[in-house]
Amino acid sequence: MDPNCSCEAGGSCACAGSCKCKKCKCTSCKKSCCSCCPLGCAKCAQGCICKGASEKCSCCA
């Protein structure tokens, strides 16, 4: 699988847990590129920036 994981929005892909995808917007890939976002974060965008603590980031307050 391409590590950039550039799949279409709403499509389907197989992002692994170690995927460092930057453009993945497919519905089947629940993992974002920001490891500090909580699993249920609806606002979480690809490439959001973590702020210090592992549970805080720029897109999930």
From Swiss-Prot:
A divalent metal cation 3 binds at C15, C19, C24, C29. Keywords: Acetylation, Cadmium, Copper, Metal-binding, Metal-thiolate cluster, Phosphoprotein, Zinc. A divalent metal cation 5 binds at C34, C36, C37, C50. Residues 30-61 are annotated as: Alpha. A divalent metal cation 7 binds at C50, C57, C59, C60. The modification Phosphoserine is found at S58. One of its GO terms (biological process) is cellular response to zinc ion. SUPFAM superfamilies: Metallothionein. Coiled coil: none annotated. A divalent metal cation 2 binds at C7, C13, C15, C26. It comes from the Eukaryota. A divalent metal cation 6 binds at C37, C41, C44, C60. GO terms for cellular component: cytoplasm; nucleus. InterPro entries: Metalthion_dom_sf (IPR017854), Metalthion_dom_sf_vert (IPR023587), Metalthion_vert (IPR000006), Metalthion_vert_metal_BS (IPR018064). GO terms for molecular function: metal ion binding; zinc ion binding. A divalent metal cation 4 binds at C33, C34, C44, C48. Gene3D superfamilies: Metallothionein Isoform II (4.10.10.10). Class I metallothioneins contain 2 metal-binding domains: four divalent ions are chelated within cluster A of the alpha domain and are coordinated via cysteinyl thiolate bridges to 11 cysteine ligands. Cluster B, the corresponding region within the beta domain, can ligate three divalent ions to 9 cysteines. Monomer. Belongs to the metallothionein superfamily. Type 1 family. Metallothioneins have a high content of cysteine residues that bind various heavy metals; these proteins are transcriptionally regulated by both heavy metals and glucocorticoids. This is Metallothionein-1H.
